Amino acid sequence: MPTARQQSGQRAEELAAEFLRAAGCEILYRNYRRRLGELDIVARADGELVVAEVRMRTSNAWGGAAASIDRRKQQRITRAANQLLQQRPDLAAMPVRFDVLVVSDPYGPSPSIEWIRHAFEAC
């Protein structure tokens, strides 16, 4: 049985995927897990491959949700994206963009989502 934190994270990822779909993105993968890391959402939008990390925080302490994606986490995301591109050569020709979606109050009456495009560069 998932913990309350895991359930909130899953809800945040569901909301983020719906948000991206509504914005015209084609969702290719959700929770793409490999040995080197995990990608929350992989989508195609306007000729780009969008690798989206979903974050949920109830407080802006320590810089908020987006600030929690440190260099080490960026490296894991980049490595997992590289694995995906090796397995899917049809996607390898597309420019890759790393975005962050910050979900606030996922169970509230009106959850909000902040979409930070080009949140970080591949490392």
Predicted regions and their residues:
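Secondary-structure boundary/capping motif
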Residues: 30-31, 53, 114-118
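Acidic-basic catalytic patches of nuclease active cores, encompassing PD-(D/E)XK
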Residues: 1-30
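Hydrophobic "anchor" residues on beta-strands that sit immediately upstream
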Residues: 26, 49, 95
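Short acidic/glycine-enriched loop/turn segments that link adjacent beta-strands
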Residues: 35-37
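Short glycine/proline- and charge-enriched loop/turn segments
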Residues: 1, 57-61, 116-117
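Domain-level recognition of nuclease-like catalytic cores that cleave nucleotide substrates
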Residues: 87-123
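Mid-chain, well-packed structural core segment of small domains
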Residues: 62-96
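Conserved catalytic cores of phosphodiester-cleaving nucleases, focusing on short active-site segments
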Residues: 39-64, 69, 77
